[in-house]
Structure formats: C-alpha cells, structure tokens
C-alpha cells in the first residue's frame, strides 16, 4: 500500500538527492 508507493518514490528520488547531499558535505 502506502509504504510500497513511498519505497518506489524513494528509489526514484535517491539518485537525485544523494549527489546534492554529497556536494554539501
């Protein structure tokens, strides 16, 4: 249900979020 949707969304967002966080660190 909801967690499955959140999991798929996270998989799509992580590749974009990780580089941004890495740059700030």
UniProtKB/Swiss-Prot annotation:
Pfam families found in the cross-reference section: Caerin_1
Subcellular location: Secreted
Location (main, coarse): secreted
Disulfide bond entries: none
Modification Leucine amide, positions: 25
GO cellular component: extracellular region
Domain notes for this protein: Contains two amphipathic alpha helix regions separated by a region of less-defined helicity and greater flexibility.
Free-text function comment from the UniProt entry: Antimicrobial peptide. Adopts an alpha helical conformation which can disrupt bacterial membranes. Strongly inhibits the formation of NO by neuronal nitric oxide synthase (nNOS) at micromolar concentrations. Acts by a non-competitive mechanism, probably by binding to calcium/calmodulin and as a consequence blocking calmodulin attachment to nNOS.
Protein's name in the database: Caerin-1.8
Biological source species: Ranoidea chloris (Red-eyed tree frog)
């Amino acid at each position: 249900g909801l967690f499955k949707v959140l999991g798929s969304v996270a998989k799509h967002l992580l590749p974009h979020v990780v580089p941004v966080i890495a740059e700030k660190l």
